[in-house]
Amino acid sequence: MKDMIRLTDYKADDLYDIFKLTDEVRQGKYQDLLKGKSAILFFPNSSIRTIVTFEKGIYLLGGQPILFSTETLDKKEDLRDVCGYLNHWADIVIARHKDIHLLEKMAEYLEVPVINAMTDVNHPCEMLTDMYALSKIRKDFTKDRFLFVGGKGNIGLAWQEASRVMGFELQQCCGQGYEMGGLMSYNNIYDAVVGKDIVCTDSLPASALTDFKECQVTTAAMKMANEDAILNPCPPFYRGEEVSKEVMESKNIF
């Protein structure tokens, strides 16, 4: 396992191995795994959660995070040349960039691992984190029925990617015309949530709010889901838009 670009590059057993490794890290193993090593990060200035958690994780494992703006990868200089230099200096490269094909090219040119920290079509580390957390609170999250509330963006496509690898059932609730394809979809949250165990959301662009007015996750909607169903909103979330203020303060929140 060299790179993490798409979850679909791996099998379910590979992801379970990552979960086991995560358990070992949490138990205090590998504290000096990255001692004397440098991790090069490419992130936009707007990133908060992902960059903080990556930098802290690298630090706790003894490594040195070195941060650049994502725009650095869009310069005129040939990407092959940039990666040639990084091969001498970096031990791992972690990048957030809208174009997944750029990350795939980096993985081709680099001799060190490349980690996808989000693109326009997926977010594998977000999915690994969510599924690992679910594995700690659910008997078998792959047997749960998932509902994604949102449009055809990177988070929805990421959940679809995860479902293909892990085999859990996934359906979508969205405004008309926002369907991802390949999934059963609903245009009303009260119909969509029936029989579901895990309700996942993504934030909405202002232009889509009217189209999603029947899709807001509320406490009343969560009561229509299965017993012990949980709400897993992807941050940043916006109260009064994809989720109600009340449901974000309820016992259903994950």
Please give the residue ranges for each predicted region.
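Glycine-rich phosphate/diphosphate-binding loop of Rossmann-like nucleotide-binding domains
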Residues: 44-56, 135-201
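Phosphate-coordination loops involved in phosphoryl transfer and adenosine-cofactor binding
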Residues: 34-39, 142-144, 228
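Hydrophobic/aromatic ligand-binding patch that stacks against planar heteroaromatic rings
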Residues: 57, 106, 162, 221, ...
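Rossmann-like adenosine-cofactor binding region
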Residues: 181-253
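Phosphate/diphosphate ligand-binding glycine-rich loop within oxidoreductases
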Residues: 34-135, 238-239, 243
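Short hydrophobic/aromatic-enriched beta-strand-loop microsegments
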Residues: 113-118, 170-173, 251-254
